[in-house]
Amino acid sequence: MLYIANDAGHSVTQWQLGMYGTKSVYAGIPGRPGDNAAQLRSPEGLTFDKYGNLYIADCENNRIQMFCPNSLDGITIAGTGQMGNSSNEFYFPHDVAFDSELNLYVTDTYNNRIQKFARIQ
C-alpha cells in the first residue's frame, strides 16, 4: 500500500499497488476542507504506528489527527486547532514521525522547532 497526503485535495489517498492499482480515500473528504473530525485542511506528513493507526500533520488546522483503521473520523491527539507557540500548539505542523519508543515527533514549521510528545501509556 502507498499513502499520499493530498494537500490541495484535503485528503489522504490509499493506493493498492499492483498491475491495476486501485485507490481509495483513507482520510478526509476530497475537495472539502474543514476542521471537524472527518475533515482535513492541507494535510502534509503522515506516518503509521505499529497498531495500524494513521497520524496526519493537519497543517492548516494546526493539529495532529489520528485515524484508527476503518474509521472515518479522526481524533486530535496534539494541537488545539489554533495557531500558537505553547507546548501543545503548532504554527503549520509539516511532518510526523515515531522513534523506537513510540514517542511522536512533529515538525512545527513557523515556530522553527520540532516537538516531542511522549508515548501515552
Annotate each predicted stretch with a short phrase:
Residues 1-4, 53-55, 103-105:
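Conserved beta-propeller blade signature
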Residues 1-25:
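Solenoidal tandem-repeat scaffolds enriched in leucines and small polar residues
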Residues 7, 17, 59, 69, ...:
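Short loop/turn segments immediately following the C-termini of beta-strands
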Residues 10-13, 23, 62-65, 112-114:
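Structural signal for beta-propeller blades
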Residues 19-44, 70-94:
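Gly/Pro-rich loop segments of beta-rich domains
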Residues 37-69:
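Loop/turn-rich, solvent-exposed surfaces of beta-rich toroidal or solenoidal domains
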